[in-house]
Amino acid sequence: MNPLIKWPGGKRREYKYIDSLIPACTRYIEPFFGGGAIFFHLRPSCALINDISQDLIYFYTLIKSDNKDFKKAISDYEHHWTSLSGYINFLYDKIQKTYMEYRINTFSKNILTAAVNDILNSGTDLFNKLFDEKFTLSNGELLKEIRENLVDKLGRMKELEIKSQSYLSEKDLRDNIETGFRSGFYMHFRNIYNDIILNRNHSKKLAGEEKSANFYFIREYCYGSMFRYNSKGEFNIPYGGIAYNKKNFKRKIDNLFSPDVIELFRNTEIYNLDFLEFLTMIKPGKEDFIFLDPPYDSDFSDYESRSFSRSDQERLAEFLYTASAKFILIIKDTPFISDLYSGKKAIRMLNFDKQYTYNVRGRNDRDVNHLIITNILNRDG
């Protein structure tokens, strides 16, 4: 079973390094859950999971309860994302013709903007038919983002053609134009996401389930599952690009509420606490197994702008020094982390290399050494 949500730092690829160590257990415990790759791979019969992210834990809680309002809200995203195809198809020939004139310098960028605006306005009746303003919250704002992103994409297409000294193929033209439309759709709902996290404007119009559906949509379609915020506290990762245009969003949603997922969460307790509060409360014992994937030793702030400092690393280490439960910790190898765990009785450290596809706010170097820190000698303990 794969993770349900795109989340940075997932450990699905690391499973091969720890498979031989994971013991049979009464309870599976994970204090830094995130996307939960190991949990979903193992599918434990009894689990306790925790994460400090309120948005993430609320998302899992809604799935666990098979919440109908959340299911409807997230299905609305899929419906409107699919409906966007009809709008694109209706206007594509006009947009393509306009771009063909723009690429040979028939008119300026300002005239391009006006021409695109006229084309979009010609599809107003279809637009208002396809997009329910109760869902979009503002069709005018959605159309504005589509216009701006489409004009920007057409401009970058021309720059690319000039740089490569060749024209894009018909397929590439269509893919790029579609990306302009879909990027505008994404940006509109990213704006709403920022209203939610900063408690502005549209946030007050949405129920909790609708906010969580927005959160899931943004996680699914932002570039590389990354998190990044500007100085105003606004999430600013762009749309994922051409490769995201044809993602099967309905299949993703169907999987969220599949019988296997519902059954797995039926046997799972979900918490939203500081990791040490969580571990102290549940009292892991010798029949339990703890998998830990904490933030790394770096200048890292978590995905809701909370820091995980060296004092937090020390709090974690102090707990693990005397843990009676079996545990596996995966973390970036730094002198500080090595010093924390070196020479401790019954704790051993194993090395492996990891290459990251994306870099998330200083968390991930492209090529780094990682440590497996554990009190397990082999699968039998």
What are these regions (language model features)?
Residues 26, 47, 289:
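Hydrophobic "anchor" residues on beta-strands that sit immediately upstream
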Residues 1-27, 32, 37-38, 42:
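S-adenosyl-L-methionine
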Residues 229-231, 235-248, 295-315:
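Mobile active-site "lid"/loop adjacent to the S-adenosyl-L-methionine
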Residues 291, 297-381:
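Long, positively charged, glycine-interspersed low-complexity recognition regions
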Residues 279-285:
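Short amphipathic alpha-helix with an adjacent loop that forms part of the alpha/beta core around
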Residues 274:
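Conserved acidic residues
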